[in-house]
Amino acid sequence: MTWDMANRKSETDIAESTWERARRRLSKTKPHALADRTWLLSGLEELDDSYKEYELSSDGEGLWYCSCYDHYGGEVRREEVCSHSAAVALYAGLPCQRTRPLKEKPKRLTPDWPCGIPGIPGKYSRWRPHQREAVELILRQWQSNGKYIALDAPTGSGKSLTAIAAAKLAGLKTVYCVVTKQLQEQIASDFPDAIVIWGRENYPCLRFTNTELTAGDCTHRKYSPCPKVNQCTYKSQKHRALAADLAVVNYSFFLNEANYVGGFSGWPVLVFDEADRAEGELMKFVSLTLTRQQLERCQIEPPEYKTKLDAWLKWAEPTLSKVGGELNRLEAGLEPYLEVEKEPPVELMRELIRYQRLHSKLKMFTTCVDARWVSELDDPEKWQFKPTFVRSFGHMLAEHGQRILAMSATMLSARDWAYNLGIEDEVTFHRVPSTFPRENRPVIHLPTADFSLKSANGEALMLMVRMVDGLLDKHKAQKGIIHAVSYKIAKYLLEHSRHQDRLISHSEAGTRAEALRRLIESEMPLVLVSPSFGRGVDLFGDRARFQICVKIPFPDLGDKQTAKRRWSGKAGERWYLLETVRAIVQMAGRIVRSADDWGVTYILDERWPRFYHQMERDFPLWFREACVW
C-alpha cells in the first residue's frame, strides 16, 4: 500500500486523500465509543483493511493512537495520519494532526459471551453488535463515580441485557423500573432471578375475604393490627423483592414506595427503562383527581364555583381539616373492637379507607397545587389538577438511586431529559448504533398536502385518500398500518377509501387490542387505521410490511396542559418539538424489529422536510440514514 503525501501542505497537514478515505469510511460505518476519547471502528475490505476492527484513542488536542500501527506494515507510516484517526476525528469533532501506535489497548471489562457473567442465563451466548461496548462504557462510568448515564438504544440493541449485565458484573443490587406489567413479566421471563412486585391492588385482602377489598385497601395499622399480616401475599412478595439482587417494578409502584414507604429507595443501581416516559409517569403520579362520588361518600361539598381554580385553592385547607377530624373519629371508633380483640365491621373499615384516601389527596393538594397548575374543571363529575412542569418534583425519581441508568429507543437528548426532571448533575450520554441495514427500513417522503389544523380541509383530505389508495394498490398483498394521528383523518379515510374491505379500526373492531389481534391473526392483507398506535406495538415480519404516517404528530394543543407548556417560553417550545421528533421515531420503529426484517415507512405531510431540517440534529443517526429524499 502506498501513501500519497504529495498534496500534504505542511508537516502537520493531512493529505486530502486521507480525508477522502476518512469520509468514505464514515459513509459506510460509524465509530463506537468505548470510553472517554476511546473508540472502536469497524474495518472495511473495500478500503483494504486487514482487520475487522480498530481501536483508537485521542488526547483531544490532535494526537491520536490507532491499533493499525500495531499491525503488519504500520511501522512504515511513521507519523502520518491514518484514515481511521481522521474518520473518528471528523465524527467526534476533534482535531487530528498525528497518529501513533496505540500505547495500550483498553482493558476488556466483560467476558467474551454474556452468559459468562454469573446470573446471566445460558441463552445469552453472544453479545449483540455494540452491546459489549455499551456495557463497558457503563462500568467505566460507575468506576469513575458517574451517577447518571443516559443510553439511547434502538430496537434490537438488547437494552435489558445491557443494563442487567453491567449491574451483575459490578455486583450491585438493582431496581429495574418499567412502564407496564407486561414488560415486568417479560424481564422476569428473560432473567429467572428477577423478582417482580406489582402494586398492592393486584393482591387479595386476606383479612376481609369475600369482598372486593385488595391489599391496596390494607387496614393493618398499629391501632388496628391485621391478624393475617404474616400471611399477606403482597407483603411476602415485597420481602422477596427487597431481598433480591434484581427487583422489577413499574413506575407507579416505585414512585409510591420510594417516596412514602422507602423500601426501594437508595439501591446501588436504579434503571429507568423507556426513560423518555419517566417525566410523564411522574406527571401522572403528582397529578390529582377529585370526583363528585368520592366527596359525597365522605359527605363533603365541592366549592360553590367549581369551575374556578381559585375557589378550589380556598376550599382545600378547611376541607382537609374537616376530613382529618372525621378520620380521627373513625379511628377512635375502632378502639372498642380492639380492646376485646374482635374484628371491626367491614363497613367501618371501608369508611375509614375512604376518608384516609381523601385525606391523602387533600394533603397533597394543599402542599403542591397553586395558580400555576393546570385545572380541568368543566366536568361536573370529576375535577383534575396537573402541574405544567414536574422539574420541582424530579427528586421523587432522581434521588432514590446511588447510580441511575436511563435507557430508551428515543432518549434523543440527555440534556433535555435531565432538565425536565430537574437533574442538574452531569449526565453521560451514549448512543448505540442500529444494526438494522438502512436499505431494509427506508423512510420515504411523498408530499401530499399540508395537514396542519388550518389546512386539513376537504381538498387536503381527498388528496390524502388518493395517495393512500395508490400505496395500498402498491402493497396489495401485504399488511400494514396507517398512523392517521387524528380521529378526523382516520374517519375520513375509512369512509372514502376504495380499499374499505381491507381497512380495520378501533371502532370497527371494538378495542385497540381487538383491532391489533385481527391484524396479526388474519391471513388477509388487512391494514390497521389508527390515530394512536405510534408506540408499544410490535409488528415484525409479515405482521406489517409498510406503514403510512399521514400527519406530523405534533402534541395536541387542544389539551390545556400541552398548550400552557408549549407557550411557556423557549423551554416549552423545545419540549413540544422534541416530543414530535420522539413520536415520529417511535412510529418508524413499529414495523422493522430485527436485522433481517424489512418494511417501508411513508410520510405524507408536506411540512415534513421543513420540520426534519429544523430538528435534524435531534433525530438519531439510524433514523437519519434511512430517510429518502
Which ranges hold each PLM region?
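Long, low-complexity, compositionally biased intrinsically disordered regions
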Residues: 1-143, 147
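A substrate-engagement module of RecA-like helicase motors
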Residues: 112-121, 171-247, 253-255, 307-343, ...
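Walker A/P-loop
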Residues: 144-166
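A contiguous, basic/glycine-rich beta-loop/short-helix subdomain that forms a polymer-engagement track
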Residues: 227-242, 260-261, 340-447, 510-512, ...
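SF2 helicase catalytic motif II
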Residues: 247, 252-253, 264-300, 378-380
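Conserved interdomain hinge at the start of the Helicase C-terminal
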Residues: 395-400, 445-485
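Conserved RecA-like P-loop NTPase helicase motor core
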Residues: 447-459, 507-609
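Conserved helicase motor "Helicase C" RecA-like lobe of SF1/SF2 P-loop NTPases
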Residues: 481-510
